[in-house]
């Protein structure tokens, strides 16, 4: 899932990787080509939160290993909870005094991961 139209690569260094994924696997984008083309560069970053929500929608769960207080990863975390997907947060995030979001998301239904069994148990069919 990319945050640009299918014909664009960001960052440019990923052009070959993106072409390989498009040819051999599946490349997904919700970004409208014509609207993207006429927007100033500064506004194009606004498509990345949509990408994060799409990534959440295509999965059973999102695992957060590390994210700062203003990280775009938190957009995907919010989307996962809103979409009824599992949200897993590694225990190390809870032990970081520089961030407050892990406790907030845990109150909203995120699963604190102390070991891999926490993930496997949560993904078992009911």
Residues of each region from the PLM?
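Glycine-biased, small-residue-rich flexible motifs in mid-sequence functional cores and linkers
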Residues: 1-126
